[in-house]
Curated annotation (Swiss-Prot):
Plays a role in transcriptional regulation. Involved in activated KRAS-mediated transcriptional activation of PRKD1. Binds to the PRKD1 promoter. Could play a role in the terminal differentiation of the intestine. Binds preferentially to methylated DNA. Residues 108-120, 213-232, 240-253 have a biased composition (Low complexity). GO terms for molecular function: DNA-binding transcription factor activity, RNA polymerase II-specific; methyl-CpG binding; transcription cis-regulatory region binding. Residues 149-208 bind DNA. InterPro entries: Caudal_activation_dom, Caudal_homeobox, HD, HD_metazoa, Homeobox_CS, Homeodomain-like_sf, HTH_motif. Residues 203-212 have a biased composition (Basic residues). SUPFAM superfamilies: Homeodomain-like (SSF46689). GO terms for cellular component: nucleus. Residues 152-173 are annotated as: Interaction with DNA. This is Homeobox protein CDX-1. Pfam families: Caudal_act, Homeodomain. It comes from Xenopus tropicalis (Western clawed frog).
Length: 262
């Protein structure tokens, strides 16, 4: 502040310079009564040098001790603090605190309750309980249907499967008339009978395809057959004939040999 600057500048005028307590404090921690210092019980003031009447007051009139520097809040000085008289204006920390803790009366009744009725996870679990899927089928109802992951699957009885298998071995493709008769006798719908025949044909194709693959693998893993005996005999005959021909001497070569001998 400006007054503090003058005091620091004119150190020669004061043998025992004592700063006014309001010059080093922030406005929010300033108290009207100046503190009492044990090191400076009183000091002499030369009248007429400074127009501030507070410098002439003895130190014994100071009644309270200001809080330590660690207790000060990091707030800057407010507007007009340098020109105002410390004895006329007082500040409190609550004036410079922008966020005030709300009292119990300011909160709505829903926020005053200590424990909420339901947590967010419990609410989410209750809202989406119907979306859960179970991997294990549930119990069968009276219509002979059971619930799987995302569709209904018909559970056939042993008698129904036996009659359907008999009909499938008789004819792989059932006619419309026979389908209606079989559905009426087995207490099924025509659509259920049709779907069973479709699934049964698909199963048969899968089994036949697997058998063909196994047969092809067995044929590829068999060892190759050795060469036949006739081929080896032919090869031997050719070799013997060639060796016998090599021992024979042509008649044209005889006189040539005789000429060389003579």
């Amino acid at each position: 502040m400006y007054v503090g600057y003058l005091l620091d500048k004119d150190n020669n005028m004061y043998p025992n310079p004592v700063r006014h307590p309001g010059l080093n404090l922030n406005p929010q921690n300033y108290v009207p009564a100046p503190p009492q210092y044990s090191d400076f019980p009183s000091y002499h003031h030369v009248p007429g040098i400074n127009s501030d009447p507070h410098h002439g007051q003895p130190g014994g009139t100071w009644s309270s001790y200001t809080p330590s520097r660690e207790d000060w809040h990091p707030y800057g000085p407010g507007p007009g603090a340098s020109s105002a008289n410390p004895a006329q204006i007082s500040f409190s920390p609550s004036d410079y605190n922008p966020v005030q803790p709300p009292g119990p009366g300011l909160l709505p009744p829903s926020l005053n309750s200590s424990v909420s009725p339901l947590s967010p996870s419990a609410q989410r679990r209750n809202l989406y309980e119907w979306m859960r899927r179970t991997g294990v089928p549930t119990s069968t109802n009276s219509n002979g249907k059971t619930r799987t992951k995302d569709k209904y699957r018909v559970v056939y009885t042993d008698h129904q499967r036996l009659e359907l298998e008999k009909e499938f071995h008789y004819s792989r493709y059932i006619t419309i008339r026979r389908k209606a008769e079989l559905a009426a006798s087995l207490a099924l719908t025509e659509r259920q009978v049709k779907i069973w025949f479709q699934n049964r044909r698909a199963k048969e194709r899968k089994v036949n395809k697997k058998k063909m693959q196994q047969q092809s693998q067995q044929a590829s893993t068999t060892t190759p057959t050795p060469p036949s005996v006739g081929t080896t005999a032919g090869m031997g005959g050719l070799c013997s004939s060639s060796s016998s021909n090599s021992n024979l001497v042509s008649p044209s070569s005889m006189p040539i040999k005789e000429e060389y001998l003579s």
